[in-house]
């Protein structure tokens, strides 16, 4: 178990975790139609920053906002490790931007890059938990980010995977996913933040499975996702879970697979959080962005007495190309 001591989100919906949560609660979506964003690319629906962003500066701002908001002074410590979650970055050698980010903050340790398709943000948090629980570091700064490009958009278009309109996860008439841009940071520690008044969370469990089914299609039985859910639910039951943050891409096969996995795990009646209609698929940032918002949603449920004290667990699950599946369980107070 490790403690979240800080977090932030930067997206087209706003800067800061609270601003993004309020946008979601108000039903505001960042999705819109782009006709001339990239040369020689067909019109597409996505959630992009109005002003094109650069990858490294956006990551740096995300970390700076998180440490400033929570008045943390840990970035240049030998007890702190930086973990970058991204699927594309801005360089074929992803360790280069990771080093630039860590060096900006004067951190003496070699950063870690987690690039595991759409599950990267959850896998990065699992990596942080394992490093802290092993006693290798006291703090881990997990930053997730991806910026869209002509290469990415045209690639998904070639798969016929993009919806021409805002996505509709789990709808019978869903047409595919929308892409998105964001940067988000979660800071984990071996110990809780002293005198914290913030309703943060603990990271209790994590699991990664590969279903070895297909390079770009999930298991039709949801096997990998089910095994992840089974692992993170060890020691608890479905009635102790307040919320499940699903992947919910609105692609035909992913949503069908997730539905099967959730039912196999006995989670079909637990409330779900589906965030792609607000942010699009932010790829390497998705697991970080959506973990923060799921935890904040669950904290609000607890504060509003919508759930009892026993229902304080939150599960966040993701799946990705290559057959990878990942899930984590948080405990919110």
Task: Indicate residue ranges for each PLM-predicted region.
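Conserved "HGTGT" condensation-loop signature of ketosynthase/thiolase-family condensing enzymes
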Residues: 1-111, 149, 162-178, 184-186, ...
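Alpha-helix C-terminal capping segments
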Residues: 104, 129-136, 296-297
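Short conserved active-site loop signatures built around small residues
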Residues: 121
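Active-site alpha-helical elements of protease catalytic centers
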Residues: 124-125, 187
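Short acidic/polar active-site loop segments enriched in Thr and Asp
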Residues: 137-138, 242
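Short acidic donor-binding loop at the edge of a beta-strand
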Residues: 138-139, 313
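Short acidic, glycine/proline-enriched helix-loop-strand junctions
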Residues: 153-162
